[in-house]
């Protein structure tokens, strides 16, 4: 690989699964219209909850997650499904999906951020184990942050190095910077980067409510998010960066 530290890196593909829209086009139209993405949460009972609204992507995974049972197969958590869908869209947007892009994906890196990981699965496992034997030598894999990237890399057919940065709210920026550094250092020619969360779970909501970070505003759900209102009660995308030389050679279009 022939790299220069000052070589310009470009974004050639984007993918989005978020409350404002599933898919890049739907997301962008929602942003332009200024549509509120806050809705009443229905994932679990509101009894005892401080707030009843949340920003939840209108996204139904192929395999539904059951709150009463542990998923039968690893990777059925909503977080994985959201991440895989966003990555697939970014690869398609960059012209690297399917058999045509298999060669480029063979050494493609994956650098992502998730602050809490597959929390829904973690909570389900803990509830199940509390009713029986807590010992399970293989359970650590589900709680391992590295497993998130490992599973996604396998499912999306990405053969390069991967890493998970659990750095919190700014994790998407960290992942982007990590991918940029990896390309400039010569570790990879191209990489998928992004941030993924599926935090609407009983434990996560309770934790945020405990520090008064959830809205208790008495209003319809769409009005619960008001960050610039003086009376406010409280206070995620995937992209595919690429070396410019590779982008020019492949005639890809830069992000607009």
Could you describe each region identified by the protein language model?
Residues 10, 109-113:
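Short, conserved beta-strand segments within well-ordered enzyme catalytic domains
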Residues 2-6, 22, 36, 92-106, ...:
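Acyl-thioester C-C bond-transforming condensing/cleaving domain
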Residues 1-73, 251-256:
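ACP-dependent fatty acid/polyketide chain-elongation machinery
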Residues 44-97, 112, 147-159:
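A glycine- and small-residue-enriched flexible loop/hinge segment at structural boundaries
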Residues 14, 113-115, 248:
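Structured loops at beta-to-helix junctions and adjacent beta-edge loops in soluble globular domains
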Residues 31, 56, 63, 114, ...:
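Structured, active/binding-site neighborhoods that engage oxygen-rich ligands
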Residues 16, 76, 165:
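Generic anion/oxyanion-binding catalytic loop in active/binding sites
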């Amino acid at each position: 690989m022939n790299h220069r530290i000052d070589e310009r890196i470009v974004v050639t593909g984007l993918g989005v699964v978020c409350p404002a829209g599933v898919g890049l086009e739907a997301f962008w139209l929602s942003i332009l219209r200024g549509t509120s993405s806050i809705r009443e949460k229905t994932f679990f009972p509101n009894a005892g909850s401080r707030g009843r609204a949340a920003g939840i992507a209108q996204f139904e995974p192929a395999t539904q997650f059951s709150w009463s049972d542990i998923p039968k197969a690893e990777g059925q958590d909503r977080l994985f499904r959201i991440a895989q869908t966003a990555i697939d869209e970014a690869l398609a947007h960059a012209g690297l999906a399917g058999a045509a892009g298999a060669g480029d994906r063979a050494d493609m890196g994956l650098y992502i951020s998730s602050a809490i990981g597959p929390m829904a699965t973690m909570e389900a496992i803990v509830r199940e184990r509390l009713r029986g034997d807590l010992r399970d030598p293989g359970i650590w894999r589900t709680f391992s942050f590295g497993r998130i990237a490992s599973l996604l890399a396998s499912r999306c057919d990405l053969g390069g190095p991967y890493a998970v940065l659990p750095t919190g709210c700014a994790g998407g920026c960290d992942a982007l910077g990590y991918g940029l550094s990896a390309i400039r250092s010569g570790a990879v020619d191209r990489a998928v980067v992004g941030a993924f969360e599926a935090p609407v779970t009983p434990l996560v909501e309770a934790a945020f409510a405990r520090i008064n970070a959830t809205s208790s505003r008495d209003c319809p759900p769409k009005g619960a998010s008001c960050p610039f209102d003086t009376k406010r009660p409280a206070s995620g995308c995937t992209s595919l960066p690429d070396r410019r030389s590779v982008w020019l050679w492949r005639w890809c279009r830069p992000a607009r």
